[in-house]
């Protein structure tokens, strides 16, 4: 067994090492005597037996007695859990269990004795002691320990020898304790011990700290294991939880292993018994302060987020109210100050952003968030936003983290996506609750107030030059970029509907006041009582269901009454409004019908309108007015060309421009920002100058500036804006904007450079068909024009005047057209398939009049033209060498005669064999002759889909020397002409119906002459040959 990977013996009756340790893990409690008798060991009993017995017993008899006594004592261990009440755990064996590699495996396999042993409070207390050991809490990083260990091994080689002796002594002790095993096990054990001694020479000795770290890790794995008995035993002893939570009282920084153990154990307990665990957590004093001491510890803060996520709208737990009462949000904002370290500031900012994401206002019922709550409402309150802005103005990491928080707040709390819009609610119909969506009115107002401070910070920030391979450049810097990003996001926020409603701010304030009055009545004691009630209801589901049913019934009755009242109150007025609005629409339509332009409107952008909007500005307009007064948008626009290589900045500037040009024009202050962008900033001139500067730079260095992509996008926004106002027939009272858009240099740029760039952007990658026309395309176009021209205008077509032209210039595109027309005679749109068969053929675009769908009114004319075209092609083919009786009689090569139909420029002719005799031989001729094979054979090709092969007859037993001859109108007509010798029977004016009659007659003649043709060895048979497709030529 020494060379086998299987480490267990073949005898399945042998116990595992864990089971052997557990045999001595229980001590029976003797109620009559004060002494406790261990059940798993019999050392004291053996000593008494040796004193009372004679010294003449043999050693073998003593061993047998010891074995029998051990087996009897093992059998005395209880088999049920209730019987273990008379036993206490032997804590001396706990270290041996933790050192065993199979402990966790035995635990997950539900080892009965192991579960009973680990459930004892004393054992659990010892495991928690391992996790909360001061050496674990104070341990240094592994990187600082490893050099000391290696250095100690090199300086003190005696440690290795001592370790070897210790292992030998352990091996001898292990051998004495396992005397009952067989000899083979002894041999394998000796070999393994020798191997372990040899390998231990190269390994450093395990220090005491490493042993304790390993045992702490195993103890944490046991306490966090998915084993119900252990978790339930911990929850029944609150003192154990209190000792575990003492980790939070340790001064920062807390080692990552200790915090990881804490998080794993508590998450398991929280999932197992959420009510009991929350009751314990909320009963802790200064919960927020203890967590914020370790705010830069990700494991602890993640666990706090998980605790917060348990407080959902449909099942509140009171966690949010407790955290608000302990001022979680103000204390987190304090940690953003520069007086804290950069890591602490970033950790606090990341926690706030994660909490905002968790509190997303989403109408999706499947969302895992908790929705808006009092903590996020406190975060966007006037006091907290003012505090955050003052911290951000200090610059550095504080500004960066603050901008990230503001962006997350705006993106996750867009009032336009609220399930119920605030402006359509009343205090009676929708009473305010602590779960109402939050509004960003205070946020926008305060940033509008402090906009000059951010503008000064943007202008005053200067950084030293940075060396680059193409020269020295000034870096943008993190602060300036974050300010630009903040302005773009605030501009997004100012366009929300709620912030541009006249009564929006007033409605929000009324609801905030009413909500504050209701929340003042609640206290922390009531919250804890609610948690206890939830715990009791957890075990009494019937009562809960009954109460919920009664409450739902009452709510339904109340809702029905309130809805009826609302209908009674608002029904008449809504009907009146609808009638008035309909009347206005009708009146507008009448005016439009009488000649009045519906979209002929004038935009009021005069100074009087500007002053009127400034007197009583809405919340959204207040921010736009601040942006205009500080000229911060123009400063950001000037940075576009100052930092030509910063694409992050260019993307932000394009975002700002896109919002301005797509913003409202008839209402609000956005029209004046648009005027500033086009008139004051002279945006069109900046774009043209930037493009010219890039061209000059490219001539000098061969490089293009990095802003060219976003420059084109901004120019496209201006172009789309001009198209919009032209289409809607909008005009400005102040013609400055229109004048900027009508300037000659901008028109020239739009019609030349911008149009060319747009065309390049819209071109499919690798599609050069429109730019480069091959010679083959030229030949095909000229040939198709000649043929169609002859077909339409030459009355002598087919009489031999143009035979030479057709035989030499017949291109593959028209051949495709010809074959597709005949093969798809039963389909509805023959010409569509024919034209589409060759994408490169420009007849598809130039000769659209040949399609039936395009000229339904002239259907008869198009049909006759098709028939005339088919007849003329047929006569032309009769005059050439597709099938010639003279060639057949002379035994000439039908391949060479058949290929004369195709242009030599496109299709290589077949090389002639060196031996002339091979020309007359069929190289595909089978060695056996098959008789009785004809058109009447019922052979079915299993791979035939009915379209891939063109075969009217049997394809496998005919010679494939001739080109494919599909059974179509043309070739049936040709076959009839060849067999009957009547070359002049097909007239130019034959219709399609007449052709069908000829086809039927030619089919009968083909079947009668088939045997004769096969005997003559001609090539009128049909080969296994693919029909022509658009790739054939």
From Swiss-Prot:
For this UniProt entry, the molecular function terms from Gene Ontology, in alphabetical order, are: protein phosphatase binding; protein phosphatase regulator activity
Q: According to its UniProt record, which protein family does this protein belong to? A: Belongs to the SAPS family.
Assembly information from the UniProt record = Associates with the SIT4 protein phosphatase catalytic subunit in a cell-cycle-dependent manner.
Q: What is the source species? A: Saccharomyces cerevisiae (strain ATCC 204508 / S288c) (Baker's yeast)
Q: Does the keyword Cytoplasm apply?
A: yes
Q: Which residues carry this modification: Phosphoserine?
A: 774, 857, 862, 892, 991
Compartments annotated for it: namely: Cytoplasm
- Record's keyword terms, sorted: Cell cycle, Cytoplasm, Phosphoprotein
Per the entry, what this protein does is: Positive regulator of protein phosphatase SIT4. Involved in the general amino acid control (GAAC) response regulated by TOR. Involved in the dephosphorylation of the elongator complex subunit IKI3.
Q: Which GO terms describe its biological process?
A: G1/S transition of mitotic cell cycle; regulation of signal transduction; TOR signaling; tRNA wobble uridine modification
Report the protein name in the record.
SIT4-associating protein SAP190
Concerning PTM, the database record says:
Hyperphosphorylated in the absence of SIT4.
Where is there biased composition of kind Basic and acidic residues? 158-170, 183-195, 858-879
The annotated regions of Polar residues compositional bias extend over: 909-924
Q: Which segments carry the region annotation Disordered?
A: 32-82, 147-213, 768-1033
GO CC, sorted alphabetically, is: cytosol; nucleus; protein serine/threonine phosphatase complex
């Amino acid at each position: 067994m020494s060379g086998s990977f299987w480490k267990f013996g073949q005898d399945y009756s042998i116990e595992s090492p864990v089971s052997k340790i557990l045999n001595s893990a229980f001590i029976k409690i003797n109620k009559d005597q004060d002494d406790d008798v261990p059940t798993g060991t019999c050392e004291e009993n053996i000593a008494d037996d040796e004193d009372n017995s004679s010294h003449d017993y043999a050693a073998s008899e003593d061993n047998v007695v010891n074995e029998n006594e051990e087996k009897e004592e093992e059998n005395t261990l209880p088999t049920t859990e209730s019987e273990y009440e008379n036993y206490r755990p032997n804590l001396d064996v706990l270290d041996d269990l933790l050192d065993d590699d199979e402990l966790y495996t035995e635990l997950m396999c539900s080892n009965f004795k192991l579960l009973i042993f680990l459930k004892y409070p004393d054992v659990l207390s010892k495991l928690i002691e391992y996790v909360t050991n001061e050496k674990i809490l104070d341990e240094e990083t592994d990187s600082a320990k490893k050099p000391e260990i290696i250095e100690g091994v090199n300086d003190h080689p005696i440690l290795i020898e001592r370790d070897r002796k210790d292992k030998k002594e352990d091996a001898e002790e292990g051998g004495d304790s396992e005397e009952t095993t067989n000899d083979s096990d002894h041999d394998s054990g000796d070999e393994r011990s020798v191997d372990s001694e040899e390998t231990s020479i190269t390994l450093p000795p395990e220090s005491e700290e490493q042993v304790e770290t390993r045992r702490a890790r195993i103890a944490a794995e046991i306490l966090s294991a998915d084993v119900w008995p252990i978790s339930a035993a911990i929850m029944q002893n609150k003192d154990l939880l209190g000792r575990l939570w003492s980790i939070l009282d340790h001064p920062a920084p807390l080692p990552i292993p200790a915090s990881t153990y804490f998080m794993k154990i508590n998450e398991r307990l929280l999932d197992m018994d959420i009510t009991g665990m929350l009751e314990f957590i909320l009963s802790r004093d200064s919960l927020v302060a203890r967590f914020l001491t370790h705010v830069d510890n990700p494991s602890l803060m993640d666990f706090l987020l998980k605790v917060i996520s348990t407080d959902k709208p449909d099942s509140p737990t009171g966690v949010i109210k407790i955290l608000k009462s302990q001022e979680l949000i103000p204390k987190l904002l304090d940690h953003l100050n520069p007086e804290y370290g950069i890591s602490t500031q970033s950790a606090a900012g990341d926690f706030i952003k994660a909490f905002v994401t968790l509190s997303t206002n989403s109408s999706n019922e499947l969302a895992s968030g908790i929705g808006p709550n009092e903590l996020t409402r406190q975060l966007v309150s006037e006091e907290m936003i003012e505090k955050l802005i003052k911290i951000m103005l200090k610059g550095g990491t504080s500004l960066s983290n603050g901008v990230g928080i503001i962006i997350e707040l705006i993106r996750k709390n867009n009032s336009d996506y609220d399930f119920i819009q605030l402006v359509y609610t009343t205090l009676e119909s929708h009473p305010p609750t602590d779960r109402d969506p939050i509004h960003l009115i205070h946020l926008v107002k305060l940033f509008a107030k402090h906009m000059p401070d951010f503008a000064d910070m943007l202008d005053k920030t200067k950084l030293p030059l940075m060396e680059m391979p193409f020269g020295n450049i000034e870096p943008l810097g993190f602060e300036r970029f974050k300010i630009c990003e903040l302005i773009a996001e605030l501009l997004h926020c100012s366009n929300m509907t709620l912030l541009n409603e006249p009564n929006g701010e007033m409605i929000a304030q009324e609801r905030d006041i009413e909500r504050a009055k209701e929340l003042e009545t609640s206290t922390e004691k009531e919250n804890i009582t609610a948690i206890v009630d939830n715990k009791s209801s957890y075990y009494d589901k019937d009562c809960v269901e009954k109460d919920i049913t009664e409450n739902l019934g009452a709510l339904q009755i109340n809702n029905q009454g309130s809805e009826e009242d609302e209908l009674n109150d608002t029904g008449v007025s809504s009907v009146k409004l609808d009638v008035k609005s309909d009347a206005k629409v009708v009146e507008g339509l009448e005016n439009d019908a009488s000649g009045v332009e519906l979209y002929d409107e004038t935009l009021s952008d005069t100074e009087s309108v500007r002053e009127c909007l400034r007197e009583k500005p809405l919340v959204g307009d207040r921010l736009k007015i601040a942006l205009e007064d500080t000229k911060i948008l123009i400063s950001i626009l000037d940075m576009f060309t100052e930092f030509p290589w910063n694409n992050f900045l260019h993307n932000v500037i394009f975002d700002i421009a896109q919002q301005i040009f797509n913003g409202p024009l008839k209402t609000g202050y956005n029209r004046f920002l648009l005027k500033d962008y086009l008139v004051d900033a002279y945006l069109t001139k900046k774009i043209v100058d930037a493009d010219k500067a890039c061209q000059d730079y490219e001539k000098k260095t061969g490089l293009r500036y990095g802003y060219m992509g976003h420059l084109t996008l901004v120019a496209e926004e201006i172009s789309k804006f001009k198209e919009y106002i032209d289409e809607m027939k909008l005009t400005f009272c102040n013609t400055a904007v229109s004048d900027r858009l009508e300037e000659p240099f901008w028109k020239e740029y739009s019609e030349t450079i911008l149009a060319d760039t747009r065309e390049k952007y819209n071109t499919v990658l690798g599609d050069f068909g429109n730019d480069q026309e091959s010679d083959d395309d030229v030949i095909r176009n000229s040939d198709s024009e000649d043929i169609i021209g002859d077909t339409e205008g030459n009355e002598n077509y087919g009489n031999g005047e143009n035979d030479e032209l057709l035989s030499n210039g017949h291109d593959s595109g028209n051949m495709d057209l010809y074959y597709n027309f005949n093969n798809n005679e039963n389909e509805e749109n023959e010409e569509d398939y024919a034209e589409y068969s060759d994408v490169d053929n420009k007849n598809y675009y130039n000769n659209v009049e040949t399609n039936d769908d395009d000229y339904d009114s002239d259907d008869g004319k198009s049909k006759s033209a098709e028939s005339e075209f088919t007849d003329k092609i047929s006569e032309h083919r009769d005059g050439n060498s597709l099938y010639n009786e003279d060639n057949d009689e002379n035994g000439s090569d039908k391949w060479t005669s058949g290929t004369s139909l195709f242009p030599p420029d496109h299709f290589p002719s077949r090389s002639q064999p060196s031996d002339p005799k091979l020309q007359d031989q069929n190289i595909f001729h089978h060695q056996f002759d098959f008789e009785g094979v004809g058109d009447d054979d019922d052979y079915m090709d299993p791979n035939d889909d009915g379209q891939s092969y063109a075969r009217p007859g049997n394809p496998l037993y005919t010679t494939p020397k001739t080109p494919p001859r599909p059974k179509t109108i043309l070739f049936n007509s040709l076959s009839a002409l060849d067999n009957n010798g009547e070359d002049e029977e097909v007239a130019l004016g034959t219709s399609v119906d007449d052709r069908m009659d000829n086809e039927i007659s030619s089919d009968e003649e083909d079947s009668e002459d088939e045997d004769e043709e096969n005997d003559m060895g001609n090539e009128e048979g049909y080969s296994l040959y693919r029909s022509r497709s658009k790739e054939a030529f």
